């Protein structure tokens, strides 16, 4: 249902019915207002751009055009860290929408008023679809449990549901952010649940498709270059021959293994903490709530989510995210190697290795006319470096779960999602703007191969290692060819050299 929703939609205009309409709404009147609230506490300030809302610490001004409430405003006041670029990642917010919808549906099964439940579900759907993104201003750098973001979601869904039912924003009547939207939930189990939902969706919609695209393009190049024999390099020095296709096949296998590692980490990501509430005991939930919520989330996303078998682990440790981040870190190592190889093999065009001709995408220098650079390789290697750094942060966060709760949750999921998005997007960019357009410079490849001293390795079985080494060293010292030197030293004839030193016969075991 939600898997294809990626574009941000504009928030709906706020249309509010008079508060009096609430009292006349069948089945919705009579909800109590907390005794510490002044009369008409949530009434709009008619001459101002804000309304007054209350939390347990007192009153706060809330912008009239926002669905969030007092706790969200208080968080924006207390955590002015980083600005808009550090806001909670959109995938987390959308994941919360999915979770809150699932919870409302299950709570209805356990007796929640259907009118309230349906309004919550409709509002939660809008959150999941990205229609209310402008109402989530909180940054990652807040409480380590993500409580403020959970309440931000609760307030937005509550007020949007209230609006749908003709009520007054901020009144918490008939839909209360805690009693109804957060029913049978705690921030301690909802935030890790949203983390796993967001990570799983990002992996399936962005990361794995990007890697698959790169894998297929590299595989096509490996087949295209299957007959091109080139000199190999070890320690960055000349080695024995292989085909360019064989070289690329190594890259293909690296990306294949990357996808395998990521998929292998996913079963733990599919385990959801929902139902554990505050410390993992499931206090204030009903028997079966956790299983039903996981099943609803699975149905909504099309992914095989299940309830976590041990909620204490699910709240206090986030080893599953560390594991996934580790798989992405290994992927970054692979992509760093692949991108570096390709840019070095394409170095030049006249003074480098020059074995590959890379696509020319844009001017490369503001001072050197005609210069073109391997920018896609550079972007990929920067992405790889960033992912490696992200993994360090995730590792530190994952190792700091204390007693019954890990309080590095927002930072961890920010970095996991960042890595997944960067690797997926970079793989697509690298594929479309570099890999598919790579050409082999066969003239240069042949020249370098025929000049290589390491072809002498083919003589080992015939004249022995020591004599072969002397041929190579003498040829290098004198600037002569292997063939000329071998004949001059009297180790073999021209005919023997031509018979034994054939690059095409040096590509595999005999």
From Swiss-Prot:
Main enzyme class: lyase
Residues the record marks as site: Important for catalytic activity: 378
Protein's UniProt name: Fumarate hydratase, mitochondrial
Record: active site: 235 (proton donor/acceptor), 365
Sites bearing Phosphothreonine, chain numbering: 85, 90, 236
Annotated residues for binding of substrate: 145-147, 176-179, 186-188, 234, 366, 371-373
Cited InterPro entries: Fum_hydII (IPR005677), Fumarase/histidase_N (IPR024083), Fumarase_C_C (IPR018951), Fumarate_lyase_CS (IPR020557), Fumarate_lyase_fam (IPR000362), Fumarate_lyase_N (IPR022761), L-Aspartase-like (IPR008948)
Effect of residue 236 to A: Abolished interaction with H2AZ1 and localization to chromatin in response to DNA damage
Positions bearing Phosphoserine: 366
GO molecular function, one term: fumarate hydratase activity
Family statement drawn from the similarity comment of this UniProt entry: Belongs to the class-II fumarase/aspartase family. Fumarase subfamily.
UniProt xrefs under SUPFAM superfamilies: L-aspartase-like
Cellular compartments per GO CC: chromosome; cytoplasm; cytosol; extracellular exosome; mitochondrial matrix; mitochondrion; nucleus; site of double-strand break
PROSITE patterns: FUMARATE_LYASES
Transit peptide segment: 1-44
Activity's dependence on pH: Optimum pH is 7.5-8.0.
EC number annotated for this UniProt entry: 4.2.1.2
Tissue specificity field: Expressed in red blood cells; underexpressed in red blood cells (cytoplasm) of patients with hereditary non-spherocytic hemolytic anemia of unknown etiology.
Gene name of the record: FH
Annotated positions of the N6-acetyllysine modification: 61, 66, 80, 94, 115, 122, 213, 223, 256, 292, 502
Gene3D superfamilies: Fumarase/aspartase (C-terminal domain), Fumarase/aspartase (Central domain), Fumarase/aspartase (N-terminal domain)
């Amino acid at each position: 249902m939600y898997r294809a929703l990626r574009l941000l939609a504009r928030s709906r205009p706020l249309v509010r019915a008079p508060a009096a309409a609430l009292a006349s709404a069948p089945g919705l009147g009579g909800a109590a207002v907390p005794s510490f609230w002044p009369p008409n506490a949530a009434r709009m300030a008619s001459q101002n751009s804000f309304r007054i809302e209350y939390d347990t610490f007192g009153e706060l001004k809330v912008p009239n055009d926002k669905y969030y409430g007092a706790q969200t405003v208080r968080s924006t006041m207390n955590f002015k860290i980083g600005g808009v670029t550090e806001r909670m990642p959109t995938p987390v917010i959308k994941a919360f929408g999915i979770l809150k919808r699932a919870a409302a549906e299950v709570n209805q099964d356990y007796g929640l008023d259907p009118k309230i439940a349906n309004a919550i579900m409709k509002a939660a759907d809008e959150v999941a679809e990205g229609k209310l993104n402008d109402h989530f201003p909180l940054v990652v750098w807040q409480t380590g449990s993500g409580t403020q973001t959970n309440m931000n979601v609760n307030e937005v869904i509550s007020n949007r549901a209230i609006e749908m039912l003709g009520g007054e924003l901020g009144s918490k009547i008939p839909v209360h952010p805690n009693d109804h939207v957060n029913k049978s939930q705690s921030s301690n189990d909802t935030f890790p649940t949203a983390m796993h939902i967001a990570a799983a969706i990002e992996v399936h919609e962005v990361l794995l498709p990007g890697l698959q695209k790169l894998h297929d393009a590299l595989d096509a190049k490996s087949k295209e270059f299957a007959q091109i024999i080139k000199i190999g390099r070890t320690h960055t020095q000349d080695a024995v021959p292989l085909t360019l296709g064989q070289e690329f096949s190594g890259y293909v296998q690296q990306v294949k293994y990357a996808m395998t590692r990521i998929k292998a980490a996913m079963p733990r990501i599919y385990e959801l903490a929902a139902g554990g509430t505050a410390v993992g005991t499931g206090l204030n939930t009903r028997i079966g709530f956790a299983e039903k919520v996981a099943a609803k989330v699975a149905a909504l996303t099309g992914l095989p989510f299940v309830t976590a078998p041990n909620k204490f682990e699910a709240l206090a440790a986030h080893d599953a995210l560390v594991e996934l981040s580790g798989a992405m870190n290994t992927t970054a190592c692979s992509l760093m190697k692949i991108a570096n190889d390709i840019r070095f093999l394409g170095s030049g065009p006249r003074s480098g290795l020059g074995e590959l001709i890379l696509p020319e995408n844009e001017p490369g220098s503001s001072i050197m006319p005609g210069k073109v650079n391997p920018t896609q390789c550079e972007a990929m290697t920067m992405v790889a470096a960033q992912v490696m750094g992200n993994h360090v942060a995730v590792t530190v966060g994952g190792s700091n779960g204390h007693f019954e709760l890990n309080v590095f949750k927002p930072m961890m999921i920010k970095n996991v999602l960042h890595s997944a998005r960067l690797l997926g997007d970079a793989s697509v960019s690298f594929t479309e703007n570099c890999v598919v357009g790579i050409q082999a410079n066969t003239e240069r490849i042949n020249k370098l191969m025929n000049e290589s001293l390491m072809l002498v390795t083919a003589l080992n079985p015939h004249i022995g290692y020591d004599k072969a080494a002397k041929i190579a060293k003498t040829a290098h010292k004198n600037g002569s060819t292997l063939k000329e030197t071998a004949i001059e030293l009297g180790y073999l004839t021209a005919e023997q050299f031509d018979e034994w030193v054939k690059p095409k016969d040096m590509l595999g075991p005999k």
